[in-house]
Amino acid sequence: MLHLTASSSGDKPTVVLVHGAFAESSSWNGVVDRLLGDGFPVVAVANPLRGVQADADYLAGLLEGIEGPVVLVGHSYGGIVIGQAAEGNDRVAALVFIGGYALDVGETAAGLTGQYEGGTLGETLVAFDLPGGAKDLYIAQDKYRAQFSADVSELESARMAATQRPIVESALNEPVRAATWKTIPSWFLFGELDKNIPVALHRFMAERAGARRTVELAGGSHSVGIPEAAQVTELIEEAAAATVLATAGDA
């Protein structure tokens, strides 16, 4: 059971960071360092990447052990997970999508992405068979930087490629059951040159969600949150200030 409470850090909400496919929780390190320095409790979740409902259930269970208000932050597929896990949890004050999917009920990551030009992820994937007939997907290491992290240093990209965690293929085709961005305030940040999620799709999702603020970073890759950790942190703290901290100040 976690005991990270808002009251332990001057009534600031706990920020829960959820990575997506082909990454892992250390991808948030630059953001974690800044948030901790600013007095925010933080949890960088190890997203199982086993399926939308399974991952959302995992996150929802983790949230039960965190006291006080929460700001959920999702990168890539992690955006799908936060959008579903927040269903029925009135302590989730804000959703922040960092190069992340904000899907509507019935939509899938693969299905919606396929409606837009510019995504090249499929060309880079390597599949491995799992017992029972399922498949795990990785990005081929020699294609990783160009596809996923072109604005990250060569050394760091190589490290990310080596430590990436796979996603089960079926997760990308699993329909979403909840779209909490319709009722929870949302913020969006993404890179102009994202090759996983085309920029036109990012713009569509942010506009559809009625985002409080949308930040589009010129030259940014799908992993734009790593080199631009300061801007990501600023947006998260803005979301906290506009929701949790604003309410506390009015009390």
How does the language model describe each region?
Residues 11-52, 70, 88:
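Conserved HGGG/HGGXW glycine-rich cap/lid loop of the alpha/beta-hydrolase fold
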Residues 54-70:
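Conserved acidic catalytic loop of the alpha/beta-hydrolase fold
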Residues 73-78, 82:
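Gly/Ala-rich beta-loop-alpha elbow adjacent to hydrolase catalytic centers
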Residues 91-92, 96-131, 168-172:
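Flexible "cap/lid" loop of the alpha/beta hydrolase fold
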Residues 133-180:
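Conserved alpha/beta-hydrolase catalytic His-Asp/Glu region
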Residues 155, 165-209, 213-229:
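Conserved serine/cysteine hydrolase catalytic core
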Residues 213-251:
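Catalytic active-site module of serine/aspartate enzymes centered on a nucleophile-bearing elbow/loop
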